[in-house]
Amino acid sequence: MLNTYITNILGIKLTEQQNGQFDAYYNLLVAYNKHTNLTRITSRDDADIKHFLDSVLISKLVDLNKVVTLCDMGAGAGFPSIPLLIVFPNIQVTIVESQIKRVQFLQELKQALGLEFNIVHDRAENFSSKNYQQFDIVTARALGELRLILEFGVPMLKVGGHFIAPKGSKFEEELTSAAHAIKVLNVELITQDLFELPLESGFRANLLFRKEKHVSGYPRPFPIIKKKPL
């Protein structure tokens, strides 16, 4: 099913190896989820659509066929970066995850899939403050509201780099709330890719921002961000 979706929607035909990696990913996710809460989505059909396909949809926004550096903040069980890496093995992925149980899962996943990616056990804002202008792409699927993740992630982007924010049906409200952050952090909204997932599985709005200029002083310490978000 996943192969059909990706072929029909993105024009990409998965290889036998890639199909095997998605199978192994699903099997490890379900097995690990029995003792560690990683996801509420456990059926294969739902995982194919809501985890794997949903993650790979990001490739509609940027060219991942060339070598690019990508940072995934708060990836949890590896979404969206690991499905992207399976399909586009040339990208250089760094995952920043604060919860040790999820880090341990990602380490097992790395070995099971035979993929190369970096796993950093840290909070996104801490990692960001030490890695200014290091990445071509930064993304975060379920880490927080838009104005927060922009402050976490934009400082890590190279000028001209892209921040991708996968959002749901309330994306317009989040954009409104993030208007000040967008201005302060010097990013521009380039694209809103709106998509209805197959089998009435939900709505996705993938928001693409471009960094126009680097601004020092961000991200601020998390207590300040939480008390006074941009």
From Swiss-Prot:
Annotated EC: 2.1.1.-
Record flagged with keyword Isomerase: no
Subcellular location: Cytoplasm
Enzyme class: transferase
GO CC, alphabetical: cytosol
Cited InterPro entries: rRNA_ssu_MeTfrase_G (IPR003682), SAM-dependent_MTases_sf (IPR029063)
Keyword Methyltransferase: yes
GO MF annotation, one: rRNA (guanine-N7-)-methyltransferase activity
Keywords from the UniProt entry: Cytoplasm, Methyltransferase, rRNA processing, S-adenosyl-L-methionine, Transferase
Domain of life (superkingdom): Bacteria
Family stated for the protein in its record: Belongs to the methyltransferase superfamily. RNA methyltransferase RsmG family.
Name under which the protein is recorded: Ribosomal RNA small subunit methyltransferase G
